[in-house]
């Protein structure tokens, strides 16, 4: 009898305390089983057989916790049966249901009336039945899935079968429809999606749109995750007015190289009855041992390709498509020296407008360039630049050009100022296939020009306070003198020289022409001053004002074909850039011809950006006898969830709209709707109107044509606010 009482007391202690049992091995290398802890209002069972817990049951094993009204645990096979308010919580998700059967060893079983929530995201779902198919593998029957918050079903996927692979963070739905506001907007027999932004092979959401040139468009991209370091996107593009085009993008990256290849191919344009294509290759390669290589190749089937079929507004304004290969070598020459060697192959595809034909640029086949510099050689700085170029052209005189430009300077510098006198000698030789000028009889020409410059400046500083902020204000006067004797160059060809835009930095350059074919004569001095406001705490430059005047002591005699100022006199330029306040920034410049006191150029822009997603831009550009344009653009929220977009580029000189954009965006908590229409003039002076409509279902898909790139290109400072 005493033995029986003792057994009953021990059994009572057993059922009143949490039970600790051993589970199956977690891994082949483990000889111990992970323990299980059970807490409940009442626990009953048989040792090594089964345990039943009733009332506020909490069962824990490792990082997995199960709560319910009633739980049966079968120790022999590690099965559990759960009834009433079942909840299974893991580190990355939570499952709810009415009835759960599950094997703790292999994580298989089923859950009735399941609900599902991802902890690391907004994904959630429910269904009629959930099958647990192993570690991190779920399969829902008659399922619904969304990323909207609880009690919000603005959009969802309704699927007969929904698989969720938590390890790969991929969902796969079969016989699925996407519903928006309970209206079916898309049906697919099969689809997969990522809820962790991982790359995966499969079809992406369809793209739909409408343009005045192509008509109604529908594209279905297929993403191919070939390897961790390269992938491809293949997109059939159906256009009601053009036919079916195939868009292809291939990307790759390695330890020493990266690049992207695009090929868009339309075998038969229904409008033109021709084959049309566009191609772009960008490749960058660190070859090692100081060598670097690059390829930039662009091509189109015809001059109207980008107007009719392009989806990048920047390309529509291009006349010459760059096609070049480049390689360079760099090494150091001791402590204060550098050596750079490079070679270049370059040509352009010119998209001619028959109404305004232009001369195609010369081909460079090839160019070899050598640059070397050695600093502080007995106080002197030596430098050398040389090149050998073969120019080619189908209609113009062409040939070889060789240049040498050695130079030496004496830099005298300290903490508050500098003086830099410099002397160089520019020598050029031409070997042409025919004389460049009818007045010349010689195909072998040369030119040698000495160049002298003297640069000097000082930096003065003082502490100041503006709007209760501490700044360092600088005053930096600068004097720059250049002397280049005149050399008659009318008989020389002009392969690549053009006059550089006049700006404040250009005041301190010896030469005013780019390229090597024209060396300007000069006897002029620049008097300039700049002032900067530098934030004392951060060291950031807040505002800069610069003004300078170039005074010419003699007439300019070397000119290009375009009208240019040749008389002695002076040019005045002033620029203001930086932040007027924390939220208002400006970039303004003005050029004044003091010979006739006329404004030659004005460039002014102001931007107001008080917060992300709030921006107002205004700009004005004027070049005498060339252009006068106004630019206005904005991105601004209104009401609670709406944003508006607008942009305009208008030519006052031609009384013509060059580009315009108008759009709206609605941002809900789990979806966004964008509508944008744009109108622009192409490089061939044709106009094009595009309409972008996109519905974005967060973390699932985008349906329609994405206007974000157009907004970024058109509205400086544009920022997405729905991320």
Swiss-Prot record:
GO terms for cellular component: cell outer membrane; transporter complex. It is found in: Cell outer membrane. Residues 1-23 form the signal peptide. One of its GO terms (biological process) is Gram-negative-bacterium-type cell outer membrane assembly. InterPro entries: LipoPS_assembly_LptD, LptD, LptD_C, OstA-like_N. Keywords: Cell outer membrane, Membrane, Signal. Together with LptE, is involved in the assembly of lipopolysaccharide (LPS) at the surface of the outer membrane. Component of the lipopolysaccharide transport and assembly complex. Interacts with LptE and LptA. Belongs to the LptD family. PANTHER family: LPS-ASSEMBLY PROTEIN (PTHR30189), LPS-ASSEMBLY PROTEIN LPTD (PTHR30189:SF1). HAMAP family: LPS_assembly_LptD. This is LPS-assembly protein LptD. It comes from Nitrosomonas europaea (strain ATCC 19718 / CIP 103999 / KCTC 2705 / NBRC 14298).
